[in-house]
Amino acid sequence: MAYALTASPAYTVRPGTVTLKDGAVFSCVFHDCSCCGLILYHLPDLEEVRIPFTDDYRYGSLYSVRIEGLTPEEWGYRYYRDDYTFDDPYARELTQVERGGQRMTLSRLYPFPEDSLPAYGSMKHRDWSERILYCVHVKGFTASRTSHSSAKGTFRGLADKALYLKKLGINGVELMPVYELRPEALGKIVGEPDGVSASDREETRRVTEEIAANTPEQPRKENYWNFGEGCYFAPKSSYALSDTPQIEFRKMVETLHKNGIEVFLQLYFTDNATIQTQLETARFYVTHYQIDGFHLKGNASALQTIASDPMLSGTALFYYNFPYEDLQKEDKENPTVGKPSVKHLCEYNDTFQTLARRFIKSDNQVLREFIRLFVTVPSGHGCVHYVTNYEGFTLADLVSYNWKHNDANGENGRDGCENNWSWNCGVEGPSHKKDIRALRNRQMRNFMTV
């Protein structure tokens, strides 16, 4: 089928897409390849239109093309580099389609009309001493029938719990990664690009089929916690009840803000994430969704860049060890602006967790060190005190088990902390004894108190 599309060079300064009234601008980085380009997929019939990139579209390693004559909502796209295709790392939305009997991920064009974006700014931030945080997995938080939510496991479901969180005294939620993950493998393109011979195609097909025939199929494990290489700009579609995850995510943030609850995101970067990508991701969520802060995890090579970025100086930043001296150095090129502040930074470490657990279960020679840490207030920056985290025992586990029992998750006991400083109150695991249950409840209240 022929489509009335026209392609012309465009000039942009960053990767990604910009949606126009009658088309879009596509930009992507390609290094050292024999051929590259854009593949457009017409969503109603999944017919493809391939746009090869020539030097006319290139500015350095950034290739940009302006496509006119398309309706953004009707098209998906992928890029190709030599023999492979891949989704756009800067896509705002991903969708799954089936083509030729195979599942394929397409990047979507999302118009982001002005009325779908929040006004720039965010709610008034609290002092660190006033913040009470709750770490949340969006899907798991309302997945149970006991959540009484009509939108279980979604952004809307979490928004429905805003009043519940407020009544608990929670005034900040830290969300585990909420963006799409990159597909684990690159897909073979349909119809090879010019320059690939028929014999090369046949050899590739033969080798691929031989490997598949001799490799036993392993059941795929769900990446439940959503840590991995991300499409950082695309809120996760499976966390949305609607077909517009961006709008649902934005409305969730607005609802939490209206209830006085700040929203912090965990950003997990792999080694493939550049400093530029990490900085742009943080700026994107602040300007587009009014996010109040970030907990950087994984490869935080952009830590110093993000922490000292003037645009993010009012945005909370959690990490395990900040280079405070380097961050507070005077700007030699512009000394009149003064030294940068670090009051938006907050230290995340397990020292308090370990001491609190040992103190509550009455370990010897821990009282003095616990009291010292309990009353110490960091100068100029924040510090999070917590007794449980998703990387180890839950609060109920902490008073029910002396040893971890991760037997059913396929990891053979390799995951989780080896030493949880826990105490089972006399019985390993669940117990029906009233005195054991009462002791465990008392211990949990003690933990909540400290």
Protein language model regions, located:
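The feature marks proteins involved in alpha-glucan
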Residues: 1-22, 50, 57-135, 142-150
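Structural beta-strand segments of beta-rich domains
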Residues: 24-27
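Short proline/glycine-enriched turn/loop motifs at strand-loop junctions of beta-rich domains
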Residues: 30-36
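Hydrophobic faces of well-ordered beta-strands that scaffold small-molecule active sites
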Residues: 132-134, 173-175, 263-265, 294, ...
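Aromatic- and acidic-residue-enriched carbohydrate-binding clefts of CAZyme catalytic domains
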Residues: 147-154, 185-258, 269-288, 405-429
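Catalytic domains of carbohydrate-active enzymes, especially glycoside hydrolases
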Residues: 160-178, 288
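Active-site neighborhood of glycoside hydrolase catalytic domains
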Residues: 247-330
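Conserved alpha/beta catalytic core and glycan-binding cleft of carbohydrate-active enzymes
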Residues: 290, 303-450
